[in-house]
Amino acid sequence: MSKDYFIGLMSGTSMDGVDAVLVQFSQGEATLVERHSQAIPKHTLSGLQRLCLPGSDEITRLGQLDRSVGLLFASAVNALLEKAGVSKEQVVAIGSHGQTVRHMPNLDMGFTLQIGDPNTIAVETGIDVIADFRRKDIALGGQGAPLVPAFHQQMFSKPDTNRIILNIGGISNVTYLPGNSQAVVGFDTGPGNTLIDAWIQQVKHEAYDKDGAWAASGETDEKLLMYLLSHSYFSMGFPKSTGRELFNQAWLEQQTAAFGHLSEADIQSTLLDVTCHSIAKDVLTLSADGELFVCGGGAFNRELMSRLHNLLPSYQIDSTASLGMNPQWVEGIAFAWLAMRHNQGLSGNLPAVTGASREAVLGSLFPAA
């Protein structure tokens, strides 16, 4: 029985579910064999959202959620294998990103923390797990993020063509793939779906703004837009990365407190423009024109995509589906790829992207045995 599959597990800052993908790699190409998305139970989601903000008794909650998320990830793997009709013996390793609960690389003693106990995943699935991908890069002086640009470079580069891969999850990040010999560049541009999700959850108790319809029904307030975009993160040079520690519901409430005269739909429209304008500014800083391919949940937001087209008329914009990779599963495939790189003793980071002092093999091995 051949053993040539890798599994990627990803749950992003939007916490909208666990993505599990079964992947085969051959001659530098990735084939998505099967995929599975598993919802995060409400009590686990509530605990994770609380843990992402300062509070009391965090260590006990952290320890328990670490196990709970590990069990959830393992359940996603087992469901994936059953759906694919593939046995655990055929899988080389699982690459698990985990669930980020803190990402603070710019402190004097910078750190990042993802939970979802890889020991639990290994025991519950019977498959070796490679996890903790980000902390080696931080130990080397880097941001620990974004890590997907190395994967984007291998899968999506095209000679003589400037390409940008834009991932819009909870946070948006870009990878610039120049068509010449320039170094690849990648960084977080700022909020992706996190603010528009937080606002619709607070006001309408809906998980997300389907197709951006609510935002489309409102009018952007230029004063609020400029106020939000004046945050220092948007003017920082790269490498840079961010997360829910900064752009969260508490921050949103504080920033919009003086704008109570606006309608709720107008605020939603303005928040969507924060995402789109911050992306467009950084994209144009990287290159005046080229091809832009979108992945992540934002690729399915019709209003968001329309606004990007309007802000970036010199770019050809499409989703990564046009490159043969479903935008929903790109990050999961990337962590299967990082597991494969670890297994082969190959580096997974790009120092030009993260600011690390050198390339390194990322992740730690947690054997099932």
UniProtKB/Swiss-Prot annotation:
Organism: Shewanella woodyi (strain ATCC 51908 / MS32)
Family: Belongs to the anhydro-N-acetylmuramic acid kinase family.
UniProt pathway: Amino-sugar metabolism; 1,6-anhydro-N-acetylmuramate degradation; Cell wall biogenesis; peptidoglycan recycling
UniProt-recorded Gene Ontology molecular function terms: ATP binding; kinase activity; phosphotransferase activity, alcohol group as acceptor
Enzyme Commission code: 2.7.1.170
Residues involved in ATP binding: G12, T13, S14, M15, D16, G17, V18, D19
Protein name: Anhydro-N-acetylmuramic acid kinase
Domain of life: Bacteria
